[in-house]
A protein has these predicted regions:
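C-terminal interaction-tip segments
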Residues: 1-21, 33, 156-168
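Short beta-strand/loop motifs in extracellular/secreted proteins, especially
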Residues: 26, 35-40, 73-75, 161-163
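Noncatalytic modules at the cell exterior or secretory-pathway interfaces
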Residues: 26-28, 100, 146-160
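Short edge beta-strand/loop segments characteristic of extracellular beta-sandwich folds
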Residues: 26-31, 63
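Short, surface-exposed beta-strand/strand-loop-strand elements in extracellular ectodomains
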Residues: 34-47, 122, 164-168
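Small/polar beta-strand repeat architecture
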Residues: 48-125
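Exposed aromatic-hydrophobic patches
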Residues: 63, 137-146
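Short proline/glycine- and polar residue-rich coil/turn motifs
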Residues: 96-98, 130-137
Length: 168
């Protein structure tokens, strides 16, 4: 493969859409605020949904009023930690339990109390980073051709001053 010369960038302070359309995420630079935070990257042009979850064994049960999902649908999801443990971020097929709850089968097992926060999207989850308390820029370079986003790159941040991406 030849060198790609049409790499572009996008910069944002806060949560939001970084770029729409089919692109490959090549590089991510972010700066923390001095408080531990997180950055979650999704393949979507719409804001991911905030919900709560619990895990028992391999089963993660997500609660969101009127979630509107159907059994067999795939969601990209990332989870906050409870007592330094979280469910495994990724892309999962859902089983609808009620109009307000659905479940996914985690890759790992354990117990996590209910009412722990999570974020999901009907687009794909691409990557996540938990940040420490350092106030210095960090860079994540994605090897090869980068991470493919079919729809766009939407970033959800907590305690992040800014993020910059390079894509092509």
């Amino acid at each position: 493969m030849t060198m790609q010369y049409d790499v572009k960038g996008s910069h944002l302070s806060g949560t939001g859409l970084m770029v729409s359309g089919r692109v490959r995420l090549k590089n991510l630079i972010y700066l923390g605020t001095g408080t531990a935070g997180s950055i979650d990257v999704f393949d979507t042009t719409t804001a991911p949904v905030s919900a709560t979850y619990a895990r028992s064994g391999y089963t993660v049960t997500v609660t969101k009023t009127a979630h509107g999902l159907t059994t067999g649908q795939t969601v990209g999801i990332t989870y906050a930690a409870a007592s330094n443990v979280s469910a495994t971020a990724g892309n999962y097929v859902v089983t609808v339990l009620t109009a307000d709850t659905f479940s996914v089968t985690d890759l790992n097992t354990g117990t996590i109390a209910s009412s722990t926060n999570c974020i999901y999207s009907t687009g794909k989850w691409l990557t996540s980073y938990n940040t420490g308390t350092a106030v210095q820029p960090f860079q994540a370079i994605f090897s090869g051709e980068g991470i493919l986003a079919q729809t766009g790159i939407y970033v959800v941040v907590t305690n992040i001053s800014f993020q910059t991406i390079q894509y092509g």
